[in-house]
Every structure is written in C-alpha cells, then in structure tokens.
C-alpha cells in the first residue's frame, strides 16, 4: 500500500491517531495525537504504547485483537494516564496495511465534556440514593435498639441474683455499640454554624494529627496557594472530612516504604460542581503514592460500608462526601497503581 496517501489523510485528521505494530510499538503519530499527548510525534514514536501510557483502564493487549479478527473494535469509555494526566477517550482500533505490513490504526476521541458531566451527575445521584437507603435502614434499626437497651436496664433491676447482671451488661454494651455504628451511618444531617475560616489552618491541623498517629515514617508535603481566600464553612466538619481522607491514605501507606502524601490547594475560577457553575472555588488535592484503588471499587467508593482497605469500616469516605455535600462542594477520585488523588472542591462565596 502506498504510504503517502494515508500519511496525507492522517496528518489532516482532527482525530488523534497512532499506528502500532503487532508488538504495540508506535510507528506513527499524527498532529492531533501530538496535541492530545502534549508530545512531539518524534518523541511519541520512540516509545511503545505501554511506555507512552502510564496506566489504562483496559488491557492494552486486547488492542491486538483486530489483527486476528480483521474487525475493528471500539471502547467508548477508556481512561489513559499520560504524564500524570488522565484522558477520558473513545478508542477505535482497526487493522491497516502500513509500509507493506499489517498494523493497527488507533483513533482516540476525547469524551465530550457534557457527557462527562452527565456521567458524574448520574454517579452522584446513585450514591445519594444508596445513602438514603442506608439512612432509612439505620433509622429503623435505631428505634428498636432504644427499646432493647431500656428493657435490659429494667430487667437488671428486677434480677434476684446480682451475678446475672453480667448478661444484662453485655446486652446494654452491645446495644450501645450498635447505636454508635448507626449514628456514624446517619452522620451529621446538616452543618453547624458557619464562619469564615482559613482552609490552610485546618489542613495543617489534619497534617499534624496524621503525622502523630502514623506509626511509620510517612512524608506529608504541602503545596498551598497563598492567594486562597477564607471560606464560609463549619470548620469542625471540614476538618473531619479532610482527616478521613488523609488518614485513609496514611493507613494504606503504612504497609510500604517511602510513603508520601501531598496536600495541594488552588483557587479555581468557573468550577463545575455537580452541574452548577461556581465563579470561585477552593480545590484541595490529596495525593498518595500507594497501591491505588482497585478499578472495581472506584465507582462505589463513597457508598456506605464500601472500603478499599483491609479492616476498614467503609464509613470514612462516605461521611467525608456527606460533609462536603453539605457545603455544596464535591469530591472526585482518580486512581491507578502508584497514584491516588482525591480532589475536593469548596465554593468560595463573596
């Protein structure tokens, strides 16, 4: 096949396009791919696909299937991480003859911002529905627990043998334990008194608490935006939300060497928070270099009783999201092996 024709066509395509050999080495990148990956074509073609992409939400080996089947394949929801940047893409892979060899034509289209927003809103609605269900069940459990505890206390007074009170004590203790769990499931339903607070002071408290609790050496780095203004908030609740996230990261990193957490703040203009445009917002990024969150848990990570950590209760992140929601903010998460970032947005009202 004459390579000049596809080169002329591909160079003018608005779709980011790569040509790969059967070992997934990159043999060609068009100008649109240079823009997508923020690298020159010369640099791109010096790499294999696995070198260019730090992490992918699909098995890259599956991309060779068209070589055997002769048919194109398309995945409309793919995430590639390149130079630490997640790219949400629709990817189509087709067999092509290039320089007299059978190769792979990979076309990548960025997922439309509106579609991403729709996915985000749908996921948030599902999370809220799950939390409402759990809260409803928690309320149903809480009422009979009070009756059970009260009955045990009355029974204790009527027992003829004082030694039998050991059993009523067990009933009361377990009822209190269940009630405490239910209270955590319910969480605070609305924020307390809001005042103008310095977010960096709250984050410093969180950092100090986590460093004191960490049994092994974990480095916590800070990268604060000095221009970040004060924010109207319930300081205790925001501290709790941040503490849950940073503590989770520290507990996961306690099982590895050279654990590092980075807390970064930025002022963001025209932030999109659950479909609503916010003129000014604070963005807090909490990043760790731990093993990452398994892909199958990422969509349900903020649901009550879901935990990516052995021995975790599955309540910390759910509570954090609830507290941030009550401040009209949002939490996002991006994770792959060696990298997890929780991003919190809080509106700045003026």
UniProtKB/Swiss-Prot annotation:
Gene field: ntrB
Residue positions binding ATP: 330
Keywords: ATP-binding, Cytoplasm, Hydrolase, Kinase, Nitrogen fixation, Nucleotide-binding, Phosphoprotein, Transferase, Two-component regulatory system
Gene3D superfamilies: 1.10.287.130, Histidine kinase-like ATPase, C-terminal domain, PAS domain
Name of the protein this chain belongs to: Sensory histidine kinase/phosphatase NtrB
GO molecular function: ATP binding; hydrolase activity; phosphorelay sensor kinase activity
EC number, as in UniProt: 2.7.13.3, 3.1.3.-
Reactions accelerated catalytically: ATP + protein L-histidine = ADP + protein N-phospho-L-histidine
